[in-house]
C-alpha cells in the first residue's frame, strides 16, 4: 500500500496540467452595433442594397471563430507559442493547441421546447497553465472581432462602390437614350412645321372647330405657330435632364453616394454572456483522488498477493 501510495503521488505530479478557460457568446445587442447600424441606415436611404443585421454579423463571427486554420495562423503570429524550436516541432505544438479549442452551439435539438430565447455558443480552450488558457482565449476573440469589423466595413464600402459604378453606367445609358429621343423629336417638329406651313395651317385646329385625324408621325394639330414655339423650346434645352425629374433625382442620389464616406466605426460583433474565465480547477482527477485510488489498488493487489500465496502453500 505504501509503495502504491508513493507511485500514485509520483504519477499525480507527473501528469500534464490541463486548465480550461470558457466563454459564452451571444448575438450583440442593438446598442453594441449602434454606430454600424447608423451608417447602414444612411447607405440604405441612398438606394444601396445592404443585406445584414446583428444575426448575420454574429454568424460571420462564429464562422471565423470555428476555423482551425485561422486559429493556427493566429497562434503562429501571436507570440503565444515558442517559435525557437524547429519547424516540425512548432507545427505539431500549434496543431495540438488548435485541437484544444472547441466551439459548441448551446441549442439542443432534442429539447426544442426548452430553448433559450436567444442564440448562444460556448467557446473553450484547454492549456497547460491557468493564465495561458485565459490569455489565448481572450487574444483569439479580440483577433476575430477585429477581422469581423474589417470585413463588414469592407463589404459595406464595396457595396457603395458597386452601386456608384452601376448608377454611372445606367445614367450615361439613359442620357444617351433621352438625347436620341430629343433629337428625333426636334427633327419631327421641323418636318411638322414644314407640313403645317405648306398646308396653310397657322393656328391650332381645335381652335377653329375642325376635327382632323392627325398624322401620328408628323403632328400638325398645333398649327405652324404652335409647332414653331414648341420647336424653339425643345431646341433651347441645353440638358436632357432639365425637364426630367427622374434623371435629376438619380443624379442627386449619385452625388450623395460619391460624397459619402464610411469611417472605421467601432462596434461589438458579439455579446459576452460569460467573458473568458480564469480556470480555478484543473481538468481531470485531483491529486487526492489519484492517491486514494492508488492506495485502494495497492490494497487490492496486496490482498490478492497474500491470498494467492496462501493458496499455493495449501
Protein language model regions, located:
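Juxtamembrane interface at the cytosolic side of transmembrane helices
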Residues: 1, 17, 283-290, 298-314
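Hydrophobic membrane-insertion alpha-helices, especially the h-region
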Residues: 1-12
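Interfacial amphipathic helix/helix-coil modules
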Residues: 252-299
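Short coil/turn motifs at secondary-structure junctions
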Residues: 28-30, 130, 300
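Extracytoplasmic
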Residues: 15-115, 183
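Soluble oligomerization/assembly scaffold segments of membrane-associated complexes
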Residues: 75-258
Amino acid at each position: 500500500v505504501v509503495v502504491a501510495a508513493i507511485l500514485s503521488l509520483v504519477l499525480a505530479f507527473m501528469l500534464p496540467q490541463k486548465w480550461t478557460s470558457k466563454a459564452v457568446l451571444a448575438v450583440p445587442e442593438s446598442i453594441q452595433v449602434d454606430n454600424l447600424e447608423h451608417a447602414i441606415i444612411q447607405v440604405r436611404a441612398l438606394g444601396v442594397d445592404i443585406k445584414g443585421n446583428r444575426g448575420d454579423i454574429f454568424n460571420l463571427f462564429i464562422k471565423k471563430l470555428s476555423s482551425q486554420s485561422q486559429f493556427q495562423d493566429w497562434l503562429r503570429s501571436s507570440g503565444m507559442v515558442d517559435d525557437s524550436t524547429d519547424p516540425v516541432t512548432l507545427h505539431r505544438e500549434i496543431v495540438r493547441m488548435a485541437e484544444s479549442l472547441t466551439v459548441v452551439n448551446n441549442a439542443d435539438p432534442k429539447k426544442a421546447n426548452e430553448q433559450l430565447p436567444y442564440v448562444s455558443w460556448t467557446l473553450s480552450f484547454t492549456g497547460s497553465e491557468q493564465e495561458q488558457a485565459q490569455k489565448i482565449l481572450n487574444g483569439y476573440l479580440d483577433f476575430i472581432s477585429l477581422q469581423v469589423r474589417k470585413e463588414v466595413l469592407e463589404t459595406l464600402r464595396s457595396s457603395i462602390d458597386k452601386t456608384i459604378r452601376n448608377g454611372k453606367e445606367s445614367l450615361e445609358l439613359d442620357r444617351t437614350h433621352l438625347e436620341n429621343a430629343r433629337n428625333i423629336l426636334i427633327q419631327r417638329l421641323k418636318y411638322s412645321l414644314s407640313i403645317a406651313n405648306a398646308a396653310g395651317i397657322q393656328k391650332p385646329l381645335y381652335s377653329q372647330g375642325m376635327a382632323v385625324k392627325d398624322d401620328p408621325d408628323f403632328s400638325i394639330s398645333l398649327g405652324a405657330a404652335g409647332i414653331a414655339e414648341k420647336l424653339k423650346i425643345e431646341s433651347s434645352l441645353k440638358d436632357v435632364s432639365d425637364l426630367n425629374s427622374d434623371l435629376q433625382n438619380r443624379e442627386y442620389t449619385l452625388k450623395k453616394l460619391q460624397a459619402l464616406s464610411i469611417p472605421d466605426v467601432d462596434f461589438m460583433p458579439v455579446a459576452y454572456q460569460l467573458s473568458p474565465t480564469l480556470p480555478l480547477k484543473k481538468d481531470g482527477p485531483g491529486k487526492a483522488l489519484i492517491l486514494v485510488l492508488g492506495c485502494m489498488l495497492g490494497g487490492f493487489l496486496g490482498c490478492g498477493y497474500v491470498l494467492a500465496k496462501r493458496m499455493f502453500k495449501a
